Amino acid sequence: MSLRKFIRRGIGLLGFLWFVSVYAYPIPDSIAVRLQGFVSALEQFGKALPQEKVYLHFDNTSYYQGDQIWFQCYVVTSEFNRPTAWSKTLYVELLNPGGEIVSRQILPIRNGRCQGNFTLTHLPFYSGFYEVRAYTKYMLNFGEATVFSRIFPVFDKPDSEGDYTQKEICRHPGKYPQKREKTRKEKKLNLRFYPEGGTLIRDVPVRVAFEATDAFGNPVDVSGCILNKEKEVVSTFRTSHEGKGVFTYVADTEEVKAEVVWRDKKYRFSLPEAEEQGFAFSVDNLSIPDSLAITVQKNRFTAAQVLGVAVMSRGKLYNFCMLTVKRNQPFSFRLDKKNLPVGVSQLVLFDKAGQVLADRLVFVGKPDTLSLAVRTDKEQYLPYDSIGISFEVNDPQGQPAQTLLSVSVRDGREEVESRHSMLTDLLLMSEIKGYVRRPSWYFESDDTLHRRALDELLMVQGWRRYEWKHWAGVEPFELKYLPEQGIELHGQVVSMVRSKPRPDVQVTSFLTKRGEEDNPTDQNTSCFDVFTTDSSGRFSFISQVEGKWNLILSVSEKGKKKDHRIVLDRVFHPEPRRYSMAELQVHISGDEKVSLPDTQLNDTVFMQENMEQLFKAYEDSLRKLGMDEKIHRIDEVVVKAKKLDKAAEVYKTRTKSIAYYDVASEMDDIQDRNGFIGDDIHELMINMNSEFYREHSPGGQEYLFYKGRMVLFAINYERTYHNEMDYNKYRLLPLEAIKSVYISEDFGTICRYADPRFTPINIDKLYRCVVLIETYPEDQISVKGGKGVRKTWLEGYSEVKDFYQPDYRVLPKENDYRRTLYWNPALSTDEQGKAYIRFYNNSRCKYPRITVETLTEDGKIGVFRQ
């Protein structure tokens, strides 16, 4: 039996392998085996490591300072969109416009669902575009782009309560810490080209998709032509939907330009450079309902090769064929697409080395969704009226569906336009890259216009969620994280100086719940365990705790304490993503008006001065006034100003700050990154905020600088006087005594806590910020861990709040301006697929807006949007 026959029979388990040979050229056995090896690796990878996806349904489309953000999480497997049985823990994070995580929830996944909320009351607060992202730790194995991310405008609290026509955001956010890469405005007109398959091939016709956008990323309609050196037209093009379109072009060695006329002005753009050798790869997904029409063509400079074509969808291999391409003519064939699942499929053309020569994304099928009927008991409602809503859910066959609904009812007045749904996210947005203006439009109809526009979208914004080089075994894949089964803690014991792993040492852990330290013997509030590190010095444990717990870890070897360091694997959150300019726009429902944020100001650079000379000049000025003594008596005065309440002063100071740090958490984070700061507060500040740095005077005195000027430290909101004892008092504080730190650049705040003998001019010349240190009460200061001991904390599952529903059977005296009238993340339908809710209106809504989403156990999606 020949090897080829053996392959045909042996890999019949795949059920879809077939060979295409142009002009009956045979396929060598050695090449067939190599191509099949990549496909086998691809299939096994998909089975062994299926991916997960996350979708969040939110209660509203925008928020104001002080609002609650409510959300329902759906965690599914990518293959069938069914509730995941893998990961049991979901991380949901709220990031401010600068990319700082201001709140985080750790939620237990049960039957693929969990729920939570954030409160927009953190300090310091500044309005802008906030990001909510969600992921399982297991998802991070496949890249940060797999993380669910949604951007919301968060507006300043309106001047008049309930005036939601006022949509103001911070116009100068650059003064706040910026961890997010800055969004930059583009040219007036931008034209980008995307050859089908990935590249232009010399002397071969290639379909080229393109996208035209303005400076803010908005799609624009243009028409134009391709001009050669002689300015002759070799091809023409025109946008079809949302600034996108496709034209066919044969590239050669000549330099060509694309010319368009927009707003009565001509613009010229360069096309991608053509490859001297290669294969053009074209996929027609529109002409034949049940097949993919594929065309492969090489040019005369490209040697004949045996190639493979793989068809994947949702992380699973669905089809594979081999073909020999020897002649410089197009070769076309068809692949059946009836067995492909609804959604995005990826076709890959690859060679015997496993290298991708070309690939293409296509959308196959029509979503088979649930039917959701929603009815209100009245057409119009009065203030504080009782609102009744009925729901009925049926499967695609018309049978009642018993499922859990996430339901949001809102006062839709001046509502920001919603652009997403579970359907668009799970089937489309999670498979492509970049911003899509209105993804729901592509699912409004199954006609030629919508199908062609969706095909062009995938040619322009195609992103490979499933990395070929890893799946096919071309490059090794590192599995960093297994699906978590609870609150997992992983760590490593290393030597103090050289950070060498310490195997076979004992790690003792002691957990006590925050606030329950006085009951260490209570099994519900404390836990004790002992582990032994493996050959790499690693250890781990799993728990199901809720809330925040104190954790003490100690290291011993043969019964003796060892001065080793314990590093915990808790720094795994993704980097904040860069916003596109198109995302930073607000569309009001039913209105095309767009609000744009102001461009961020560039950071100001300040000149440094010799601080010792400045202080000396200041002291000399005091002596001239006869104030060289430490204590001075003044005549009796009458103070007429009203004294500011201390609590009010503290709150006001916090609101004007630009950054907040929980010092214990920050120190833990530094240690988890295998860093060391000892008791140096300057080192702590530098680690927490990159704007801080050290400067040394000629006399060797160390100063901390911030954005070009010195830093003023104030402890517990008390003034800092310019004398040796008071000015350096902050450096004597043990870091364990510091509860939190606020940074303020507000000039009034700096003056409030600076030495009152300084003039405002001197203060402005001297200080750039004030670091406000808040300390623990003396009896609450933690004792520093001893030899081989690490005192830290364990974050358990977050405590979930319930949405508040007011009872207006007795009318209230005050107005009610709630924007979210009703939120239920888990409303259950009965056996007839029906459910009913009743709640009270606010003081002005007439026509509530309703959004309902659901996902059944077999992966059927249901969406209702009003």
Which residues make up each language-model segment?
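Internal, hydrophobic beta-strand segments that form the core of beta-sheet-rich folds
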Residues: Q72-C73, Y130-Y138, V348, T851-L855
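Short strand-turn-strand beta-turns centered on an Asx-Gly dipeptide
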Residues: K229-E230, L712-Y721
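Short beta-strand segments within Ig-like beta-sandwich modules, predominantly Fibronectin type-III
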Residues: I106-I109, S235-H241, C321-R327, D529-D534, ...
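A short tyrosine-centered beta-strand micro-motif
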Residues: G128-A134, V256, S345-L347, W549
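Contiguous segments within soluble domain cores/interaction surfaces
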Residues: S30-E52, H57, Y63-Y64, Q68-P108, ...
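Surface-exposed, low-complexity/disordered segments
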Residues: F45-L49, N60, Y64, A85, ...
